[in-house]
Amino acid sequence: LSKYYSINKLTGKIIWSKINTSPFNSEIKIINDKFFVIDQENIIYCYSIKDGKQIWSYKTENFFIKTRKKLSIIINDNKIVFNNSIGDITALDINNGSLIWQIPTQNNQIYADTITLSTSSLVNDQEYIIFSNNKNEFYSLDLSNGFINWKQKINSFIRPIVTEKIIF
């Protein structure tokens, strides 16, 4: 179980408190009156900041062994993009949670490989998504459709740093 709260910053008073059936395992992203989080079952949730009620959720494929690496979420316009513990990158409509695109980055038939997968945080560079993993893969994806722009053989799961024309 995972408990989450809204607390008044000035008084410390709990405004509301809710429970999720599975522990959260991601960054938390906030936009407007909503916040987004992924649990250990690879389900992304959209909650209301006002009262903590679930607005929508979307379940991606899961594996019985849970990752310790925090999953990553980025927001771009009306899209929320995130990774799951088996290497899939998914883009959803931020308002209703409907699928826009999804791309696997691993051969999910080989479960032994996904057990040890560790992915960097996703980096939003305008129309690109940049990320890497510990399986010798460094990606640039097209944010609009999920297509692979390029893939390099670089072994790193540290968050990439993107400048105007260079990635570190």
Segments (PLM) and residue ranges:
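Extracytoplasmic beta-rich repeat domains
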Residues: 1, 13-32, 53-77, 98-126, ...
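Short loop/turn segments that connect beta-strands within beta-propeller blades
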Residues: 8-12, 48-52, 94-97, 142-145
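Repeat-solenoid scaffold signature
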Residues: 79-80, 87
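Structural recognition of beta-strand segments within beta-rich domains
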Residues: 133, 139-141
